[in-house]
Amino acid sequence: MNIFVSCSSSDKISDEYKVVTRFLMESISKDNDLVFGCANRGLMGICYNEFLKNNRKITGVCYEMYKSDLEGLKLDEVHMVKYIKKYLMIMTLIHCVKCLIQH
């Protein structure tokens, strides 16, 4: 099952959020695949690394203006989008949205 994660990619975030995110992702990433916004920092980076550690399928959906964020990421699939409408459409139509984590 795909898990869509939408969360902060900022490194300037309370450690409390990092601990909770890691705890949740350690469990969720064992039996699910990740769909996320292509950042390897902040809470999004924690999510990415937990799924990577468990050898799960990782799909990124990235705005064209942030394509440099793809550097160094190990992704099984990437969808580049120009507008938020297409971003949301991909998330809802192509992938089974099961879990939403926001900060």
Regions found by a protein language model. Give the residues of each.
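Acidic/glycine-enriched connector segments
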Residues: 42-103
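Glycine-rich beta-alpha loop segments
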Residues: 1-56
